[in-house]
């Protein structure tokens, strides 16, 4: 199911352009339009899910697939840790407005390409 006015659903349908880096039958990954790091990719399910708070038990494999795709993209973009654990990346789900979720379609941020500090913002 897709939502008519959801910007990410519009990207899935090809109605809004995006700089895609990965696509399969379950997920789509593309560059964030407001990156916070040299590499900032959003991985979204093609199925409209509002967020973590609305996940159903049948979505468990889909969320696991999103993490697998994130790892593959990190490897492809050269930000995955090497054997000495140099480099690296951060995976983030923002859940709700107070956490910074601005698009209410489940999405996983893959952020890297620079040293990350903690705590974030």
UniProtKB/Swiss-Prot annotation:
One of its GO terms (cellular component) is cytoplasm. PROSITE patterns: HIT_1, HIT_2. Transmembrane segments: none annotated. It holds the Pfam family HIT. Disulfide bonds: none annotated. A motif (Histidine triad motif) lies at residues 105-109. Residues 7-121 form the HIT domain. Gene3D superfamilies: HIT-like. GO terms for molecular function: hydrolase activity. This is Uncharacterized HIT-like protein aq_141. It comes from Aquifex aeolicus (strain VF5).
């Amino acid at each position: 199911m897709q939502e008519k006015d959801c910007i990410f659903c519009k990207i899935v349908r090809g109605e809004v352009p995006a700089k895609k880096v990965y696509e399969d039958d379950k997920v789509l990954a593309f560059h964030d339009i407001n990156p916070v790091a040299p590499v900032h990719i959003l991985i979204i399910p093609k199925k409209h899910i509002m967020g973590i708070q609305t996940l159903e038990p049948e979505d468990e494999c889909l969320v696991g697939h999103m993490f697998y795709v994130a790892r593959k993209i990190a490897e492809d973009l050269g930000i995955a840790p090497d054997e000495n654990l140099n480099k690296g990346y951060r995976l983030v789900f923002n859940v709700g407005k107070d956490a910074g979720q601005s698009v209410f379609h489940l999405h996983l941020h893959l952020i890297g390409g620079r040293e990350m500090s903690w705590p974030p913002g």
